[in-house]
């Protein structure tokens, strides 16, 4: 099992689940690993290449940081492969396990607009603090947020997307930049995951212009 990273709470849960399966099924040996961050592309690539060529494994579960690259790496593989979190568009992949990111984000965007209106915002604008730029999961969530916000009558500021590599600390820095650029406040901040949303909200705490801002997360650190 090769995850995007093992350095976040969300992925630690995934790791624990895989290891629990191995414990409950002693005839199946599961090895779980992951990159040190969601931008450690070369590190994950080396893991995948090494394990595919080792001959030591009968099946693979991969959460790709770069799905197009992994598609090339697994070409011609006959061992079963399952994609997790971000799909890999390749015939070698038997199944995909993950969230309907675009649809779920769209629902979140719609709910955020309604909450912003209820909070008293006349100008309902949304800015996104996203994950890793170019990542399929992050892109799907952005697309969904934009769709949901727009359909509910809000304005999604697409040109002001902040990319924070799915990391809470960077999300806080992005929020500082947003507050500097929008001193009068922004109605909605949509984030790639819950950890980022909480970090952004903490960064805005004490700023009266953001007292009624709606912060939207997605999932715990994913």
Give the residues covered by each predicted segment.
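A residue-level marker of the well-folded mature domains of exported/periplasmic proteins
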Residues: 1-222
């Amino acid at each position: 099992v090769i995850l995007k990273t093992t350095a976040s709470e969300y992925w630690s849960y995934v790791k624990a689940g895989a290891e629990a399966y191995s414990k409950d099924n002693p005839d199946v040996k599961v090895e779980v690993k992951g990159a040190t961050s969601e931008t450690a592309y070369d590190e994950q690539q080396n893991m995948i290449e090494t394990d595919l060529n080792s001959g030591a494994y009968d099946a693979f579960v991969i959460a790709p940081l770069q799905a197009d690259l992994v598609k090339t790496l697994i070409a011609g593989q006959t061992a079963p492969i399952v994609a997790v979190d971000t799909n890999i568009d390749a015939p070698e992949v038997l199944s995909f396990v993950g969230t309907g990111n675009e649809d779920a984000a769209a629902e979140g965007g719609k709910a955020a607009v309604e909450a912003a209106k209820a909070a008293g915002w006349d100008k309902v604008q949304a800015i996104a603090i996203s994950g890793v730029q170019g990542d399929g999961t992050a892109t799907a969530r952005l697309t969904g947020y934009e769709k949901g916000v727009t359909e509910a009558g809000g304005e999604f500021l697409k040109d002001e997307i902040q990319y924070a590599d799915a990391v809470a600390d960077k999300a806080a820095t992005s929020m500082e930049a947003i507050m500097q650029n929008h001193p009068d406040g922004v109605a909605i901040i949509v984030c790639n995951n819950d950890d980022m949303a909480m970090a952004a909200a903490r960064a805005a705490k004490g700023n009266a212009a953001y007292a009624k801002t709606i912060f939207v997360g997605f999932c715990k650190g994913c």
